[in-house]
């Protein structure tokens, strides 16, 4: 395969792929690299990029906004984190591959960079943003004061791990016949219900009944990380909580990754291709990244690329000054994430969504006013995007008068007969 040619060595068992299964799967279908498949794919592809003489990597840069003329994209304004200057990257074709927006929530499995930057920029440029209410909450993020955003892979449950309460009692049989292998939304809601009903800080995932040598070999990364925190997963259950994990919505694209803005493409989690529906099945995200990246490249290569650019105005920073109140940015960052977790989380209601909308409207105005007055920083850029994305998520959630997939509203607990997309466009 292309990935194997790039150096990804999938785990083998007797000369064949060691396939595993995860939530929502009916059979073993996932090729993996122990318990760090994503890391292996990313590391090897990055090594390939670094060897290419015709590719230049610009590290420590952060996109601010897309360069749009009419309905055509010509690149982006980009913030240099070292010089603190904004420069223009002009291009014939622009591809967004910026990931999702799970950092909108207080608890997430994602890194700090998952602030929905690409989706927010695309929205401001006039792109269709689709189905942003479908945020997937992964059921099992490690719960520990010294662990940040560490995911306990779904493959543990695929290999037989059980979810238990602090007293050791199993509970998934109360929610779904598929038990721990029910889809993520079902498992996350079950855990959330048990925690809120009983006042627990977390539940536990137990695989300690398996052979310890097998556990260490099959899950070396999880075993090591938990061990550094004093948790021996071979003899003790793992404390876990649900956390925001994946953005199923995003920039609407066709099968070639083209958005409704000419020369602007989106691939990976930033995009809404439609393949995940209202609830992504485990491990399909890596497949989507590879398939649509290749489709995007083919589409660009078969079309002619011109050599004429419009005149791009330089970034104007003459009317702003350095801020002496960065505490405002820090405070609003935390406030947005708490609002999203408390009012727009795993279980929603119209009252909570309207309350979130009201609060976010005020914060959005405050951030935009701040943005117009002061010199931009990377934190301010990400806060601006975070607030914009949070508003879009709430607006999308309020527009859906049903419960479907990852969106569960207590006021509309049933699913409508006919599926539809929620589409948000800048007015």
Locations of regions flagged by a protein language model:
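FAD-site-proximal beta/loop scaffold in flavoenzymes
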Residues: 65-83, 88, 231-275, 281
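Flavin (primarily FAD) binding-site architecture
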Residues: 96-108
